[in-house]
Every structure is written in C-alpha cells, then in structure tokens.
Amino acid sequence: ARACGNTVYSDVHLGDWGLQIGLVIAELNERNPGWKCFSEDFDPDKDSVPELNADLLSEVYPFASKKSKEDEAFKEKAHIATFDLQNGRAGYIALWKEILRVSIADLKSNYSKLGVDFDYWYGESDADKYIPELMKILEDKHLSYESDGALVVDVAKEDDKAPMPPVIVRKSDNSSIYATTDLATIIQRNRDFAPDRIWYVVDNRQELHFTQVFRCARRAQLVPDSTDLEFLGFGTMNGTDGKPYKTRDGGVMRLSD
C-alpha cells in the first residue's frame, strides 16, 4: 500500500491488557508475595517494582497458563488480577509497566533482526480510555443486552451459512475482553487517523473474531460506511506434531534462538 503512494500507519497492537497479563501478575504474586507492588498501600511515587527480564516472563506465562487450567482458585486469582489492573490498582499498574518495558524491548530486538518496524507501539491498554464511550454508543443505539451476566451484541445475518454467535463486549465479572478493546481501538483509529482502510494482518484462526468485531462496528457506526475494515489472515508456525505453536502452552522455541 505504501509503495503505491498511500499514506500508511503501522501499529503492532500489543495484547497488553487482558487475562494473559493477569496470569503473569497472579503467578508473580504467588512466587513473591512480599513484593511491595502486591500491597494495597503501594505508592507509585515512593515504591518501585523489581526489575524483570524476558527469560523470566517467557517461563512464567506458560507456567501460569497451564496452572490456571488445573487450579480453579488460581484461575480466579488471575481473573481478579486482570480486573484490578484494568481498574487502576497502583501496584499492578507499576508491575504491568515493567512487564511491558521488558516485552517491548525484546520484541523490538527480534523485529530489528527481521527488518521490521512499526510507526506505533500501541496496545490494548491505549484503547482503554475509549471503552466507556464504546459502551455508551452500544447502549444508546440499543445494541447491547445482558446474556448470562455478560453484555453482548448480536451480529448474525439472515444469509449466514454457519452459526454466528453474539460478540461479548463485557464479561460477567465486568472486565473487558479482546473484542471490547478491538472495538475501542476502531474508535481510536478513526479519531486519530480517519483512515480510508484499516487492515488487520493476523492469524487465520482469528477470522471469526474479526467478523464479529467488524459487524458490531458497522452496526454501531463506529466508522463511516466508506471506511474499509479488512481481515488479512496468515498461517501458523507448527510443531513436529502438526499443531500450531502456542506461547501460553510453553515448549516453544523462541524466535531469538
């Protein structure tokens, strides 16, 4: 697109605001309960968090992910940590910033070796401030409704060849999820750039998710009808068993290696 003379802005869009962060925070808490950032009286102006590194985070995340599938109490702890982070708990915000610092430095190092760069290093967290506006739009347009404690929006069409489930915009515990931040990000991008096209270059397995998100965005008129929302899927790196690598499952060769 850029080679054809178009003005193009690239954004890495980090997954830095969901359960994966809550899992890491919960596991670090279990291993290091004495860290000041886990105290209710953490003061960001006076207190600090320990310095982390990429090797530690690469070990903690898959460990915590596996643990959450076997331990319901830990899974609930991770959900609570996610909720508290998204609601501004000071110690968690400070720890999150350290996790982000380490992660971005590691990503930039790898991308540099591949000759890849981005104009923006935004994450889901950058769209967080647009979520209240998103929820109000969905409510004012009578698009959102409660289902089993969660808030959802119908996106099915009469000519769908396969079932199209509603998109969940708020979980039953009132926390935001992937779709919430993706919809809020559409508001952000339209506000910042007023683009003619927004392309999502992501894993093929995300196609259903983005179909739901795009349909919801259209129903809510988050972008003008003239703005194209397009999913550009790519394949996966698979292991010897033929199954895609999953960072959260562990045992995956790091790109830097």
What are these regions (language model features)?
Residues 2-257:
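NTP-dependent nucleotidyl-transfer catalytic core
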